[in-house]
């Protein structure tokens, strides 16, 4: 019954936006963009912070009026940065964190825009990448692990900002093409072509990039960074085809497929292989 109600609500919202696109097109796109970019979960409250995050040194960084929440576990000179995905936060790394901390490494995690304890209502990849750049400047990690939208943000960051010190990058359930993400959203709400065109125009105007060019395949084409792509064949959030696209163009990366883990990829064996890949000579 809940699924039916959610389906009807979603389609009703899409129907309203489509109607609005003919009478108030600007308002229609604004509404569509809010639903697309404003996460509905993933926030944290300081008074009820998950225990794993309590064990860290917490610091808030500031960037152009934004507050960026970071978590820092001190260790040796090996610094690893963790980047979570959509409607999530840094606590999602709890099981992997245990494995990483056992190596004595220094671990840094950040909450994405509008997630965790970071402020704001809007999430977008360029903004997340700017958060990441500030954290990288401060902590200078040599290794990055990104899940889902954290993965594509790590790719975009490396392409846009460039970090010559980055040695290895691990992508977990990461999408390649932003056009696929948008297509799935438009399909979910059954939004019309007017809204699609508005998204393309807005992205070009605001971020100076065409949606069809916002592609991990293109960003990684000449990347010398060693990589590990981990993706589950049963992932229904980001299809396995996205991992195959990344692996086809990222020549210095290996693709590891799993079965039955879904999008989250929470698994002890996966975590052990990540640690082995990062710390092998």
Tell me what each language-model feature is.
Residues 3-60:
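An N-terminal hydrophobic leader/cap segment in hydrolases
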Residues 90, 97-119:
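Conserved alpha/beta-hydrolase
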Residues 122-142:
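Alpha/beta-hydrolase active-site loop
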Residues 146-154:
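Gly/Ala-rich beta-loop-alpha elbow adjacent to hydrolase catalytic centers
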Residues 163-209:
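Hydrolase active-site cap/lid region
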Residues 222-224, 229-231, 235:
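Short beta-strand/loop motif that positions the catalytic acidic residue
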Residues 236-242:
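Conserved alpha/beta-hydrolase "acid-adjacent" motif
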Residues 261-271:
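Catalytic histidine-centered segment of alpha/beta-hydrolase-like enzymes
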């Amino acid at each position: 019954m809940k699924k039916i109600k959610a389906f009807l609500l979603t389609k009703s919202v899409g129907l309203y936006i489509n109607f609005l696109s003919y009478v108030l097109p600007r308002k229609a796109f604004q509404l569509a963009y809010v639903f697309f970019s404003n996460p509905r979960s993933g926030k944290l409250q300081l008074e009820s912070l998950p225990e794993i995050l309590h064990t860290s040194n917490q610091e808030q960084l500031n960037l152009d009026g934004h507050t960026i929440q970071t978590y820092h576990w001190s260790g040796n000179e090996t610094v690893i940065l963790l980047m979570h995905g959509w409607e999530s936060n840094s606590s999602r790394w709890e099981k992997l964190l245990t494995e990483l901390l056992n190596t004595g490494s220094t671990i840094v995690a950040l909450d994405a825009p509008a997630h965790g304890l970071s402020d704001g209502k809007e999430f977008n990849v360029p903004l997340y990448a700017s958060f990441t750049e500030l954290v990288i400047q401060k902590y200078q990690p040599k290794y990055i692990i990104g899940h889902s939208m954290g993965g594509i943000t790590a790719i975009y960051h490396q392409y846009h900002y460039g970090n010559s010190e980055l040695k290895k990058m691990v992508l977990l359930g990461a999408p390649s093409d932003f056009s696929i993400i948008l297509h799935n959203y438009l399909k979910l709400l059954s939004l019309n072509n007017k809204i699609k065109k508005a998204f393309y125009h807005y992205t070009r105007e605001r971020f100076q990039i065409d949606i069809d060019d916002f592609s991990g395949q293109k960003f990684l084409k000449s990347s010398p960074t060693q990589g590990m792509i981990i993706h589950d064949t049963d992932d229904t959030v980001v299809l396995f085809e996205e991992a195959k696209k990344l692996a086809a163009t990222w020549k210095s990366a290996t693709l590891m497929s799993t079965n039955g883990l879904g999008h989250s990829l929470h698994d002890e064996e996966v975590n052990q292989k990540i640690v082995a890949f990062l710390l092998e000579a």
